[in-house]
Amino acid sequence: MTVSYLTKLKGSPAPIPSRPALKEICFISFGAFLAACVIGYLAYSTSYPIIMGSFGASIFVLFVLPESPFAQPRNVVLGHFVTTLVGLIFFQLVSSDWWSMAIALAIAIALMQILRISHPPAGSNPFIVFLLGANWDYLWMPTLIGSVLIVLVALFYNNISEVRSYPKYWNPYYITLQAWLNSSLGALL
């Protein structure tokens, strides 16, 4: 048992992913810069807290991995919303102790998977809520407003590229229904 476990730890002989072309790296980096500028400028010019620590990782996912299921708009916005809501419920209504934070994180991760809105950067939101001692307003600003803004920048910017197309889907339930209808209709014809 111990040997097989230790064998797993050494990894597999998978190659390191290739580096993107310099042109692509510049395109990605400029998109990330624009998204950070939008939320940064609005935060500083309006004095509203639109910036959230997990948004840096969200911006990475949206611009470096736009085809990933984790980068799709519903995953980004709803992932942030649900995990922040869970963090607030536990912080405000259960306890501000460490164990409450751990339970909030576990439930937030489970809900993202159940609801099919997994967005890894949003997993840090319960921790952020507890560390800041956030109140209920944190759910709307920065969580909802900020996540919508970075998705809007990603929608605009990623589609400027001739080789990128974002998003891949808005609602996976629609895609599943569409595929089922196509296969059912195809079988009838």
Each PLM stretch: what is its role?
Residues 1-81, 85, 89, 94-102, ...:
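Alpha-helical transmembrane segments and their membrane-interface boundaries
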Residues 50-65, 105-135:
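Pore- and pathway-forming membrane helices of multi-pass small-molecule/ion transporters and channels
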